[in-house]
Amino acid sequence: MALNVDCDILNADGGTRCASITAANLALRLAVRRLIANGQCLPLEMRPTDEEKKSGWKAPTLTPEQQMEHENRVIPHDLAAISVGLIEGDVYLDLDYVLDSNADVDMNVVKTADGKYVELQGTGEESTFSGEELSALIALADAGLDGLFEVQAAILDGIN
């Protein structure tokens, strides 16, 4: 089974693209959760053989603990993205259009909840930037992403 999550962002700043990545993670997790609950996404050892399918096999019901364990095998870590920027030497988080269009340097950071980077995309549009400034951008992005992971967990808590 394959799931495609498609977010068409036709005209947007970095913050909108990052928000769509973060929202797509929630959509994917909810879709997987629903497939597991409906018996359409089962652990490998519980999947029917072709012969069982032909003979009227019924999907087993997983306990809530089994569902959560399987969900975490399917999607081991949540994903989020956030934008950061450097404007006249100051570091900003989650740039809106005005900040994004005035940024000397802007960066999109995509990361997993276990702390692994998926993407660091930064551009010195109006200026170059130092290693120290890069570290400050990443540190602020990391703090913002930690907050997004907390929000994602709160949203997903209790939703089946």
PLM regions: where:
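Polyanion-binding surfaces on beta-sheet-dominated domains and ring/shell assemblies
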Residues: 1-160
